[in-house]
Curated annotation (Swiss-Prot):
Protein name stated in the entry: Disulfide bond formation protein B
Annotated membrane topology: Multi-pass membrane protein
Recorded family membership: Belongs to the DsbB family.
Residue ranges annotated as Cytoplasmic topological domain: 1-14, 66-71, 164-176
Entry's transmembrane regions: 15-31, 50-65, 72-89, 145-163
Primary location: membrane
Sample GO molecular function, one term: electron transfer activity
GO BP: any one term: response to heat
Domain of life: Bacteria
Keyword DNA-binding attributed: no
Matches recorded under InterPro entries: DiS_bond_form_DsbB/BdbC (IPR003752), Disulphide_bond_form_DsbB (IPR022920), DsbB (IPR050183), DsbB-like_sf (IPR023380)
Periplasmic side: 32-49, 90-144
Lipid metabolism listed as a keyword: no
Amino acid sequence: MLRFLNQCSQGRGAWLLMAFTALALELTALWFQHVMLLKPCVLCIYERCALFGVLGAALIGAIAPKTPLRYVAMVIWLYSAFRGVQLTYEHTMLQLYPSPFATCDFMVRFPEWLPLDKWVPQVFVASGDCAERQWDFLGLEMPQWLLGIFIAYLIVAVLVVISQPFKAKKRDLFGR
């Protein structure tokens, strides 16, 4: 399995698949916000940024999968997935155990040199409350679904990093 993951990390297909999944999730978030009129909270915006990190890592990995640039992509992927797990766990706890003493910030805080909320307000402005439950599917709230997604991204990222010392087999996928 590790050789297969190493082989996948050196091809564009797996990186593009990861980019496609992250882009699909971002577009779904925008659908919820602009079509279903759900208000994203501060943690939702940070989770969106972590997902953009996964998307960016996938695009970097797809650019040059056989060069050391893929290691940069793996580091960004690991960091973004880890931060996504942290943020969605915190968001899930705020929704499952609401408290007037534990709340999220009122505004998103981006660095002064990267004011995403001012550059692209349709995507990065928060207007909702983190503890408010706005949507569920099969009994799980949106942060709980994202927690599972980020955990999956993180597990696969760790396995791909572990697989790097193993040499990929020199055959195509059809065994010729």
